[in-house]
């Protein structure tokens, strides 16, 4: 019951708020109109059935008091005694409610962490099975008010699964692996930060969407976290999270007994190793009595693990589980285990097989407080993957799904990509174990196989940026993750509409516009990045950001496409290929084994086919590639105009922040489109039926302009430059000029310039028409955008700037002057002169 029809949602405009940084996220508690009658209908008192400041019930009272005041201008008193329901909000646990209030009223049934919310006129009851649940109920009530929803309700709700955690990949030096929102809020210079004020703000956000656990450090863990002084720092962090019902856990380095403890081994069967980990665990729980447990990445991507000593992964996990058992702690053991040195020359090699190969033989051998944490797909957070078959192969083992809020392969928060529709393709997938309904969401909850533990983990990676993730719009994914972890059957569109109202207000125009943009964003990104199950065609060897399809193949990482002159795709059939399809239960395996029953959107995941293979749509594979990439880029262009239509409805600071990123995405989507299409056009030799690929009548190639101080440069990968060539200044101390006479009909155009914005320099460019300045800009995207920068001319650094509504006469002289800086040689790719309504 998160949604309702907000009373004020039909207002055309609520007015523009003061500038906002985004720090409050969806907990802005922005003012909602509330007249005298409205004020009189609100409770005047808040009764918290616990006065201990570290109690989530106490926090609930403070949140309710602040929220009522900020949202509705209502001043409500807070007390911890009495139980009058007259014009009061009573918040507490079931036990406290029955004891203190001597309540004869029947309380509905709900599970641990669940709550009951009852709103009757001016009487509000918020009763949790635990103190954490009571806090969740308080946030639920405030969410309703903040959305203008004053409905009278009475319902109980319980979580889908007991584990609802977030993972942070924060390093001890303060950097964050795959983090795009600034440095760590936890660590700096090898120790825990002294200033942990952002941690409390993060705790509020997480608790408001019912997250109950956090791993604060990188899975590629540094053993120094286990030094006594850092354990003390972890206790400080845990003290901040505790009042919000969030338990803290840590990632461990398997070799810590050797690297930190000076033991000669880290064999999980060695008594000295077992004792060492037992002592570490004792020390941690002495400081953090409610510690959640450990997250372990072992024998993966160079990380140490038990197989070094011919022990199984279960042996390693159980060593930690037994140290945690007396304290009620949990081991989250990652299933992301594979060999990244396999040879593509062997047709039957397949990284996708690894999880089942490693873990299926161990089913039933993990202790009951071990949870195997499984990425949603068999590879690595790709734009589309089938559900991991490991979910269907662990009957006697607790499992959790691992999602990724941080957009490692999906635009790194510089592209708008709303992820829940992607996640729902996995959560709602029926694996048909034993020919019975076996939805992934029911497996991870423990319901399908009657397991005591299970749930959710998401790699989030917030940082010190005021937007938390590097983009205001990316916060919709964190919000939605919490919502889905509580109730995975929720509709993705309903969730984002709630987030929009809480983040940007009740203006119906804002809600409708952002809903459309959000729901179109993942399909658009899939279209211009990678289609038909081929994976995200990004540079897997470098930044995981821009296009580089060749990087998928010819190495041991196993994200292969097996693309050649005639054909493309992985043959994962049992009959001819890697036998991956056979890892699924029979009904699903049969669907994927047969090319006729394999969905088009996963065709190239399961089958190696000619480029001329016909899809169910009737198109060939290669023509689908061409069309989809154009369609996706065209959709991305519309995000700019849609957002601009909200200019007078959103505060200037957030408006400009989002606009900058959407303009960038519009340009970078064209970089993606052209790179992928040019690569496969060059590889296959098959022309685009619509004659778009390689044909750009509105472009002026930089290398074809008159150059002074600039020289041509062969870009690598070749497809990330129009006509495979850019221009750079002859030296880093030389100003370059590129000039051309424009042969376009007189009219008003958008003047676009594609260039490269490299890390390590901030070049400056000025554009002239007939010696009149049209505009200028600086290559400073590393200061503005969140994605991993590049030191090369490539698909990561390629970008576009557009000057709109430029009056151009046929025969005008265009001149671009570039001044290099640092290692950046003011590189240019091409100029495009676009008539109204044309997407280059």
UniProtKB/Swiss-Prot annotation:
Q: Which regions span the lipid bilayer?
A: none
Instruction: Give the record's GO biological process terms.
Output: xylan catabolic process
* Catalysed reactions, semicolon-separated: an alpha-D-glucuronoside + H2O = D-glucuronate + an alcohol
Q: Give the record's keywords alphabetically.
A: Carbohydrate metabolism, Glycoprotein, Glycosidase, Hydrolase, Polysaccharide degradation, Secreted, Signal, Xylan degradation
Enzyme class at the top of the EC tree: hydrolase
Concerning InterPro entries, the annotation shows: A-glucoronidase_C_sf (IPR037054), Glyco_hydro_67_aGlcAse (IPR011395), Glyco_hydro_67_aGlcAse_N (IPR005154), Glyco_hydro_67_C (IPR011099), Glyco_hydro_67_cat (IPR011100), Glycoside_hydrolase_SF (IPR017853), Hex-like_dom2 (IPR029018)
Signal peptide region: 1-19
Query: Where is the major localization of this protein?
Result: secreted
Glycosylated residues? 50, 149, 222, 262, 279, 310, 465, 527, 576, 610, 682, 723, 732
Pfam (any one):
Glyco_hydro_67M
Q: Which domain of life is it from?
A: Eukaryota
Give the Enzyme Commission number. Answer: 3.2.1.139
Q: What is one GO cellular-component annotation here?
A: extracellular region
The GO terms this record gives for MF are: alpha-glucuronidase activity
Q: Where in the cell is it found?
A: Secreted
| Family, per entry | Belongs to the glycosyl hydrolase 67 family.
Describe the function of this protein: Alpha-glucuronidase involved in the hydrolysis of xylan, a major structural heterogeneous polysaccharide found in plant biomass representing the second most abundant polysaccharide in the biosphere, after cellulose. Releases 4-O-methylglucuronic acid from xylan.
What name does the UniProt record give this protein?
A: Probable alpha-glucuronidase A
Q: Which gene encodes it?
A: aguA
């Amino acid at each position: 019951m998160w949604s309702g029809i907000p009373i004020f949602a039909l207002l055309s405009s609520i007015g523009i708020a003061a500038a906002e940084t985004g720090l409050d996220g969806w907990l802005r508690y922005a003012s909602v109109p509330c007249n005298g009658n409205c004020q009189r209908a609100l409770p005047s008192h808040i009764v918290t059935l616990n006065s201990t400041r570290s109690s989530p019930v106490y926090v609930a009272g403070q949140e309710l008091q602040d929220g009522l005041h900020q949202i509705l201008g209502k001043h409500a008193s807070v007390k911890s005694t009495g139980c009058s329901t007259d014009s009061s909000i009573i918040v507490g646990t079931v036990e406290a409610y029955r004891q203190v209030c001597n309540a004869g009223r029947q309380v509905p049934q709900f599970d641990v962490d669940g709550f009951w919310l009852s709103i009757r006129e001016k009487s509000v009851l918020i009763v949790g099975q635990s103190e954490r649940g009571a806090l969740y109920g308080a946030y639920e009530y405030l969410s309703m008010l903040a959305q203008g929803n004053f409905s009278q309700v009475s319902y109980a709700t319980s979580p889908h699964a007991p584990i609802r955690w977030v993972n942070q990949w924060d390093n001890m030096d303060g950097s964050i692996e795959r983090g795009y929102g600034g440095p760590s809020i936890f660590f700096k210079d090898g120790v825990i930060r002294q200033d942990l004020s952002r941690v409390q703000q993060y705790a509020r956000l997480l608790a408001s969407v019912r997250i109950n656990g956090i791993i604060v450090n990188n899975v590629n863990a540094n053993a120094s976290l286990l030094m006594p002084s850092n354990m003390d720092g972890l206790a400080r962090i845990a003290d901040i999270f505790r009042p919000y019902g969030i338990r803290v856990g840590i990632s461990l380095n398997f070799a810590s007994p050797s690297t930190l403890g000076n033991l000669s081994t880290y064999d999980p069967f060695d008594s000295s190793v077992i004792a060492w980990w037992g002592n570490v665990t004792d020390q941690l729980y002495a400081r953090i009595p409610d510690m959640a447990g450990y997250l372990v990445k072992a024998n993966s991507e160079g990380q140490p693990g038990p197989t070094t000593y011919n022990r199984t992964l279960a042996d390693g996990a159980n060593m930690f589980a037994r140290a945690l058992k007396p304290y009620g702690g949990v081991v989250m053991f990652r299933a992301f285990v594979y060999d990244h040195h396999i040879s593509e020359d062997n047709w039957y090699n397949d990284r996708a097989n690894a999880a089942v190969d490693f873990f299926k033989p161990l089913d039933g051998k993990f202790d009951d407080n071990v949870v195997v944490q499984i990425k949603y797909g068999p590879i690595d957070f790709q734009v589309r993957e089938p559900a991991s078959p490991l979910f269907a192969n662990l009957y006697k083992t607790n499992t959790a799904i691992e999602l990724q809020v941080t957009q490692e392969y999906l635009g790194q928060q510089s592209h708008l990509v709303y992820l829940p529709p992607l996640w729902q393709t996995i959560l709602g997938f029926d694996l048909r174990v034993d020919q019975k309904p076996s939805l992934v969401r029911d497996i991870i909850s423990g319901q399908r196989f009657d397991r005591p533990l299970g749930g959710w983990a998401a790699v989030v990676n917030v940082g010190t940026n005021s937007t938390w993730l590097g983009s205001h719009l990316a916060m919709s994914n964190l919000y939605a993750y919490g919502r889905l972890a509580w109730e995975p059957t929720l509709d993705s569109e309903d969730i984002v509409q709630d987030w929009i109202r809480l983040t940007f207000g009740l203006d119906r125009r804002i809600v409708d516009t952002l809903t459309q943009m959000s729901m179109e964003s993942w399909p658009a990104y899939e279209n211009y990045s990678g289609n038909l199950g081929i994976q995200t065609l990004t540079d897997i060897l470098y930044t995981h950001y821009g296009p580089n399809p060749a990087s998928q193949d010819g190495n041991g990482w196993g994200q292969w496409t097996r693309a050649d002159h005639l054909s493309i795709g992985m043959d994962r059939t049992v009959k001819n290929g890697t036998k991956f399809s056979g890892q699924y239960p029979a009904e699903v395996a049969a669907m994927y084994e047969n090319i006729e029953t394999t969905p088009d959107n996963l065709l190239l995941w399961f089958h190696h086919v000619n480029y001329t293979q016909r899809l169910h749509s009737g198109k060939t594979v290669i023509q689908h590639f061409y069309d989809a990439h154009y369609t996706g880029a065209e959709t991305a262009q519309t995000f700019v105009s849609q957002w601009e239509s909200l200019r007078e409805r959103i505060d200037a600071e957030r408006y400009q922040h989002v606009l900058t990123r959407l303009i960038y995405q519009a340009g970078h989507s064209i970089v993606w489109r052209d790179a992928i299409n040019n690569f496969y056009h060059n590889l296959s030799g098959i022309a685009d039926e619509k004659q778009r690929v390689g044909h750009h009548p509105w472009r002026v190639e930089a290398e074809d302009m008159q150059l002074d101080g600039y020289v041509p440069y062969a870009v690598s990968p070749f497809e990330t430059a129009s006509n495979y060539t850019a221009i750079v200044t002859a030296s880093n101390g030389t100003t370059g000029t590129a000039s051309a006479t424009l042969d376009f009909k007189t009219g008003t155009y958008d003047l676009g310039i594609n260039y490269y914005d490299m890390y390590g320099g901030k070049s400056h460019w000025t554009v002239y028409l007939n010696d009149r300045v049209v505009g200028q800009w600086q290559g400073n995207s590393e200061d503005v955008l969140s994605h991993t920068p590049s030191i090369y001319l490539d698909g990561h650094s390629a970008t576009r700037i557009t000057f709109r509504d430029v009056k151009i006469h046929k025969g005008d002289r265009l001149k671009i002057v570039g001044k290099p800086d640092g290692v950046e040689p003011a590189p240019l790719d091409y100029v495009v002169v676009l008539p109204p309504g044309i997407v280059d």
